[in-house]
Structures are given as structure tokens and as C-alpha cells.
A protein has these predicted regions:
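Helix-turn-helix
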Residues: 22, 26-68
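Hydrophobic/aromatic-rich alpha-helical bundle segments in the mid-to-C-terminal region
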Residues: 125, 129, 144-187
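Hydrophobic alpha-helical connector segments
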Residues: 68, 79-112, 157-160
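N-terminal intrinsically disordered/low-complexity leader segments
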Residues: 1-18, 148
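Solvent-exposed, amphipathic alpha-helical segments
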Residues: 26-34, 80, 84, 114, ...
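Hydrophobic/aromatic residues within well-ordered alpha-helical segments
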Residues: 62, 69, 73-77, 91, ...
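Conserved catalytic core of Hanks-type protein kinase domains
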Residues: 105, 118, 163
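Amphipathic alpha-helical packing segments from all-alpha helical-bundle domains
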Residues: 78, 105-109, 113, 122-147, ...
Length: 187
């Protein structure tokens, strides 16, 4: 049998090399689409076009993947939402831009909404608690910078955050708002 390089059959295409971040991102995609309970190794591997071995190369368990996905979401959410507002010196304009930002981004809302439904999960609850606390602190500080007293700022922050969570619950069941309608909503 001739096995010179010219006569060997082509090697089969290899699956892409995945990182732990790739697995965490696809887990977040599934959370957004189907919830925390839908995060399972075999379906994720099929979705990525790889074997379970790729998963176990990066994670010892589903819980470890879920933890990595939650950490990724927490970090990216912080950077995307609050990082983009750091350059705005006017606290009122910063709050307005924050409301516009959270009113138009759907993927982070979907993940957050699904995580709120899974608060009984031991990995989810502390992440939501940290994210909520950080958001409330940010809102309180912004309202303080806008001239409200500490107590007024805390109350306004809680009310604003509660309205945001309620907005997320109502949003999937309401007609989609146009940009102009959302701007009126903010006024």
C-alpha cells in the first residue's frame, strides 16, 4: 500500500478548538433562551459541534460551567452597562443614558430575567444579590450627584430598580415599543 503524502486521503475536518469562555458564552445563550435548568453538557456540546470531552477539558462539572457563565455575565454586564457611562460627567444625563441603554438591550435582559426565575439555585442567588446591590449603589450615587439627599436617593434608586425589574417582566408580553415611545416613557 502506497502511503506517500500525495495518496493519503484528506484528514477529516477538526472541530474548532473551544475555550472555557466559549462554553460559558453558549451556556449564557441557553440561559437567555430557555433558562438555567436547560444548561446541560450534551446539548451544549451538540450546539457547539463538539464532543463532551471538550467540556470536561475545561470544567469538572455542570455546576462549574454554570459558575463560569454567571461570572462572565456579571463581568460583561458590569462593563457593558456601567463602563459605557463613566465618561458622562452630568449625573442627570448619565441616568438618562443608563435608562436608554437598559431599555433597548434585549439579550442582557433575557439573561437577567431568566436568572431571576432561578433564585433558588445556590449559584444564581449570590450573583443576583451582588449585581442588584451594585446597581442600587450606582443608582443611589447618581441620584446623590444629581442633588438628592441620601435618603431620597436611596428611595429613588429602589423605586427605579423595581420599575426596571417590572419592565423586564412586562416587556415580553407587551407590544414592542418604538424608540419614540420609549423616550416618552422615560419622560
Amino acid at each position: 500500500m502506497n502511503t506517500s503524502p500525495a495518496t493519503l486521503p484528506p484528514a477529516p475536518a477538526r472541530a474548532p478548538r473551544l475555550s472555557a469562555a466559549d462554553w460559558a458564552q453558549v451556556a449564557l445563550d441557553v440561559i437567555a433562551e430557555q433558562g438555567v435548568a436547560a444548561v446541560a453538557v450534551e446539548p451544549l456540546a451538540r450546539r457547539l459541534g463538539v464532543t463532551k470531552g471538550s467540556f470536561y477539558w475545561h470544567f469538572p462539572s455542570r455546576d462549574a460551567l454554570l459558575q463560569a457563565a454567571l461570572e462572565r455575565w456579571e463581568e460583561v454586564e458590569q462593563q457593558q452597562v456601567f463602563g459605557s457611562l463613566e465618561e458622562e460627567p452630568d449625573p442627570r444625563e448619565r441616568l438618562r443614558r443608563l435608562f436608554q441603554l437598559v431599555g433597548h438591550e434585549t439579550r442582557p435582559h433575557a439573561i437577567y430575567s431568566e436568572l431571576l426565575k432561578a433564585l433558588e439555585h445556590p449559584a444564581v442567588a449570590p450573583v443576583i444579590q451582588r449585581v442588584s446591590q451594585r446597581r442600587l449603589e450606582y443608582l443611589t450615587a447618581s441620584f446623590r450627584q444629581a442633588g438628592l439627599s441620601r435618603n431620597e436617593a436611596q428611595n429613588r434608586a429602589r423605586l427605579t430598580y423595581a420599575a426596571y425589574v417590572g419592565f423586564l417582566q412586562l416587556r415580553p408580553h407587551q407590544p414592542k415599543m418604538t424608540h419614540e415611545e420609549f423616550e416618552e416613557y422615560l419622560e
